[in-house]
């Protein structure tokens, strides 16, 4: 069901796929909803589909926030949602009614999430710049992703090991702050969650722009390092430094990426 819902979102409701004979065909996503809901296991949906458009980091992140909204499995509309359209069903997932056992569907976004992320490997950038992990903590539906360059050499305080744990609260921990927000939303979901989502979208869209700006600054520093190395005949050793934790050739690039990653992660506490 979760795969069907993700496909449904990314294809705008139309599954385009190879029929196994080399032919690309398109079918309404709802042609397979009975399979997704477990009513017709013989009506197998395709293993993969072609998205309606190029998939962005934001697209993937938003899929991970899904609770089947707008589908027959929409968890905000059945009796289990209560009076505040809560799209969560607490464990255990099954229940009995009139002698029959029923099971609540598992959504993509879920309350027991510790952390979540979207990895972005950008081959059109040098290795020292191209890797990004958009990282978040607690429930994906009520937390935002912050960009962390993979060459960052310092851990933000909010993600630091030892800054709180599962049983020890810390008001400087990303997990605990997001956990507070999430639990507040669970009490009045239809009132609070839309406001939180608005703030999430604003932050993530802003960072998409800032990442591009930061990339350009990092590229300038990278080119300066490469030009300087070439003049000194040290291009090979510089190439090694790209992936070395101790390499100094790209120290300016790494410092820039680290500062941006750490400062951005800490913005939630401002």
Give, region by region, the residue ranges found by the protein language model.
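C-terminus-biased signal that marks the final domain/tail of proteins
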Residues: 1-270
């Amino acid at each position: 069901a979760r795969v069907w819902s993700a496909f449904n979102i990314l294809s705008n409701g139309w599954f385009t796929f190879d029929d196994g004979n080399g032919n690309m065909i398109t079918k309404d996503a709802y042609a397979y909803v009975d399979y997704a809901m477990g009513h017709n296991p013989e009506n197998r949906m395709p293993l993969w589909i072609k998205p309606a458009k190029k998939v962005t980091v934001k697209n993937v992140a938003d899929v991970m926030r899904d609770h089947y909204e707008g589908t027959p499995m929409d968890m905000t509309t059945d009796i289990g949602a209560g009076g505040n359209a809560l799209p969560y069903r607490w464990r255990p997932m099954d229940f009995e009614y009139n002698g029959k056992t029923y099971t609540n569907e598992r959504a993509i976004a879920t309350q027991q999430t510790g952390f979540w992320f979207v990895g972005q490997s950008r081959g059109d950038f040098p290795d020292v710049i191209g890797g990004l992990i958009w990282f978040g903590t607690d429930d994906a539906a009520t937390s935002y992703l912050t960009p962390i360059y993979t060459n960052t050499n310092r851990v933000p305080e909010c993600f630091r090991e030892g800054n709180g744990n599962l049983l020890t609260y810390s008001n400087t921990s990303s997990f605990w702050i997001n956990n507070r927000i999430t639990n507040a939303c669970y009490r009045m979901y239809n009132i609070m969650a839309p406001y939180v989502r608005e703030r999430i979208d604003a932050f993530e869209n802003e960072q998409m722009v800032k990442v591009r700006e930061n990339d350009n600054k990092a590229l300038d520093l990278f080119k300066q390092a490469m030009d300087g190395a070439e003049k000194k005949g040290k291009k090979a050793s510089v190439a090694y430094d790209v992936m070395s934790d101790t390499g100094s050739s790209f120290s300016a690039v790494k410092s820039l990426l680290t500062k941006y990653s750490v400062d951005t992660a800490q913005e939630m506490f401002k």
